[in-house]
Amino acid sequence: MAVDTTAEVKAIARYIRMSPHKVRRVLDQIRGRSYREALIILEFMPYRACDPILKVLRSAAANAEHNEGLDRATLVVSQAYADGGPSLRRYRPRAQGRAYQIRKPTCHITVAVAPEITEE
């Protein structure tokens, strides 16, 4: 399966309130798959990370169709990765006037799609 990376189109969701480690677990399942196959996988996986990834994947496909004129049926997930974003810091009160810091991680999800080249 050959992919034309020169016509690669991507979409990015930034500051998603989720751990990048948990998002990567789902992204590993769809990387290299066709657009339709990735949609089906994300629809039926039980993880919370699937919703924002599904949104980004649909956005990338819409960008490919609208901006580049590509057909959704030929698209393949060429890249899918999650980078860490800034952590939100919250404080939890503890005994005797102390406070512990709670870090709430965020991440940036990037999904790139490219058309599959049919070899003749």
Curated annotation (Swiss-Prot):
Keywords: Ribonucleoprotein, Ribosomal protein, RNA-binding, rRNA-binding. It comes from the Bacteria. SUPFAM superfamilies: Ribosomal protein L22 (SSF54843). The keyword Transport does not apply. GO terms for molecular function: rRNA binding; structural constituent of ribosome. One of its GO terms (biological process) is translation. One of its GO terms (cellular component) is cytosolic large ribosomal subunit. Pfam families: Ribosomal_L22. InterPro entries: Ribosomal_uL22 (IPR001063), Ribosomal_uL22_bac/chlpt-type (IPR005727), Ribosomal_uL22_bac/org-type (IPR047867), Ribosomal_uL22_CS (IPR018260), Ribosomal_uL22_sf (IPR036394). Part of the 50S ribosomal subunit. This protein binds specifically to 23S rRNA; its binding is stimulated by other ribosomal proteins, e.g. L4, L17, and L20. It is important during the early stages of 50S assembly. It makes multiple contacts with different domains of the 23S rRNA in the assembled 50S subunit and ribosome. The globular domain of the protein is located near the polypeptide exit tunnel on the outside of the subunit, while an extended beta-hairpin is found that lines the wall of the exit tunnel in the center of the 70S ribosome. Belongs to the universal ribosomal protein uL22 family. HAMAP family: Ribosomal_uL22_B. This is Large ribosomal subunit protein uL22. It comes from Rippkaea orientalis (strain PCC 8801 / RF-1) (Cyanothece sp. (strain PCC 8801)). The lineage of its organism: Bacteria, Bacillati, Cyanobacteriota, Cyanophyceae, Oscillatoriophycideae.
